[in-house]
From Swiss-Prot:
Belongs to the ABC transporter superfamily. UvrA family. This is UvrABC system protein A. The lineage of its organism: Bacteria, Bacillati, Bacillota, Bacilli, Bacillales. Pfam families: UvrA_DNA-bind (PF17755), UvrA_inter (PF17760). ATP binds at residues 33-40, 639-646. It is found in: Cytoplasm. It comes from Staphylococcus aureus (strain COL).
Amino acid sequence: MKEPSIVVKGARAHNLKDIDIELPKNKLIVMTGLSGSGKSSLAFDTIYAEGQRRYVESLSAYARQFLGQMDKPDVDTIEGLSPAISIDQKTTSKNPRSTVATVTEIYDYIRLLYARVGKPYCPNHNIEIESQTVQQMVDRIMELEARTKIQLLAPVIAHRKGSHEKLIEDIGKKGYVRLRIDGEIVDVNDVPTLDKNKNHTIEVVVDRLVVKDGIETRLADSIETALELSEGQLTVDVIDGEDLKFSESHACPICGFSIGELEPRMFSFNSPFGACPTCDGLGQKLTVDVDLVVPDKDKTLNEGAIEPWIPTSSDFYPTLLKRVCEVYKINMDKPFKKLTERQRDILLYGSGDKEIEFTFTQRQGGTRKRTMVFEGVVPNISRRFHESPSEYTREMMSKYMTELPCETCHGKRLSREALSVYVGGLNIGEVVEYSISQALNYYKNIDLSEQDQAIANQILKEIISRLTFLNNVGLEYLTLNRASGTLSGGEAQRIRLATQIGSRLTGVLYVLDEPSIGLHQRDNDRLINTLKEMRDLGNTLIVVEHDDDTMRAADYLVDIGPGAGEHGGQIVSSGTPQKVMKDKKSLTGQYLSGKKRIEVPEYRRPASDRKISIRGARSNNLKGVDVDIPLSIMTVVTGVSGSGKSSLVNEVLYKSLAQKINKSKVKPGLYDKIEGIDQLDKIIDIDQSPIGRTPRSNPATYTGVFDDIRDVFAQTNEAKIRGYQKGRFSFNVKGGRCEACKGDGIIKIEMHFLPDVYVPCEVCDGKRYNRETLEVTYKGKNIADILEMTVEEATQFFENIPKIKRKLQTLVDVGLGYVTLGQQATTLSGGEAQRVKLASELHKRSTGKSIYILDEPTTGLHVDDISRLLKVLNRLVENGDTVVIIEHNLDVIKTADYIIDLGPEGGSGGGTIVATGTPEDIAQTKSSYTGKYLKEVLERDKQNTEDK
């Protein structure tokens, strides 16, 4: 019987050239090929898109409007499709409330565990809270000052949606006269209609009393009635005082600290019942940072030391500052750091109640006199941020503010009550500070009583199962409270991968995009085993991947190429990895079999005396690291995932240099000192973020070559005759562009129930320019024709104009010859965007004082692309510049001049320097995981060289 398969016929999405392919079902399929060859076009834009579209099509029109409909991919037929799930890197939640624990649903089970077997303790006296008797409640109320007026309330509805009409009617029938609804006392017969879509709290007024001797019996009776009405809860409304809360279940006998019935929502920082009231469950507060307000303390007040008050169109703040200095005799020509502590305090935090009179010039002209108390710069920024109706003002003020842990909950996000409940000796805030491996160990060995163990058994099973999956995909170093927005693309993808395994679905088509990103070689085997486990459940996995180990582990390997862009889009080879390795046409096969490889350099640049010295780096998990980064060579920072590479390079090195050199507002991670910054004059972070967020941005505009091309067109005879300047050939401004589409070339048509449709502009036929502009030509081509050329074509076309050719040649050198000059920035992959940035740096004149920082530049790159990338990076170093790379890819690591290896483990087990030196030095370091794998690669390459 024929094995089931997915049959694709006539796929033409993007650069795919009408390809037909049959893929075996229930197998691990890896698609590979050069960057831009068409892998994602086949995997995501064809197979996944059609699988998803067919599923959505089966839903009702009502449901479809919420899901949004996917376009039908450009393909003739696809047979044998299963429901498709895509696990890519782009869908990480940036919501500050989203954490590793919430995304994986582990937190839901932990909350349930605390609600079922948690033991509440009084935070003031550290004793377990037992249930309160009516007598204890009476005694506590009688301690109130004599003649205090009180109302006994029975909470019958606690923060629940609904209009609650029936309940209110029943309360009236029982003879109760008053209610407190959402804090307001109302007559039971005059209750306004409640909005059923809002949460409400309803309390019955059971009795109203004045505290005095002799009311104990009546008080006890009323308390019993209230407890019966509200299932054991009682609120005492102390007139002109704070409410007292009592519970038949939980309260401290010494201080009366009481806690309501334990329920899961009490432990949720996304619920008003559990969230810290100060920070609303965010764990952080935006606070004015003095270091951002006065970034350069060597400046004087006259030189603009207080940055937010540097003069603008109104001189209100500079005049106020001048007057304050006159009143308090503060020298405005003295460096800020040399002012006395008292003087700095007055400037930053205000002058108390003393009023100051001054006259300032208004924005519209004219002068005005004001008398006011000087509040201080810090309170002024805070007030304007919180109270200003202007979005612009709030944005400007936020530049001088930093997220700091909330003072009430100390960053734990939860209320005092929630943090007073313990299981196994820890509260929920302490548990989520554990890394995944620590939490797994804790829950496997948790010590519970026999009764609690019976209750918690099923919950613990779910928690341990999910933690095990996360551990198995190499994420053991992540803490449970880590914010989702701070995860790398690879980490976020592996979290979703672990969640999917936990769901135990079968018969599904999973499409994954480079799950090995950010993963050290040590953890690769665990990831591959996870993928195989998903396959063995009866699922089909299509993985777009360049990783050597993953390709070798595939059941079926598809090599797409042979080149990129126009030169790709074909199936070069497919079959088992062994079959592809034997195929001489397959570039991937040649690299896999060792016939082609990236060579180890014959000569490594020695580390010179010129260096950046970092001392006492303590950002995140770094343990007071001291390290030297040599200048004018290529340094690669390595280490297992979570070892502290990004903390050292991005948080400490980049941010501190950006702050000093670029005068950036970023706040670096903690460190004692950094020396050697004066040897640099430029720091550039070349990441994989888009080169522009609108279709108007493209490689030509980003690299600046489009300016030169517009100059050429403005110099043509036709342009001179017509009086056209350079601006005429811009599609961003009026004049030369087509006004029907405002220079976009496309028009958006909104469709209800269907996705928005983009159609070429009928007026300019998608050319972006008006007819008159397009009549100007250079060598027979108009400006729109130039934008449609590939970089390779344009390089030949402008070969006689050195300025343009030089810039275009750098794009060819980084492997982007296939991209069109006018390709929209939004359609470039992360790897392509990064290489456009590299190209724009390459054609600039080097000073030899620049430092380039790259975080995993091999993401999305084939081995052949990596080879090209390394040549480009070496060109930067040959100019005398410095390159610092965070990388796991052994081909990059083996070509480095110098390596800084962090570890030894991830998370709390990392954050120290394991070894530094040349790749050969690291390979000899027994304690280095990187060294172990590097040694194998260096020996294999040496063997291959000798065999030749």
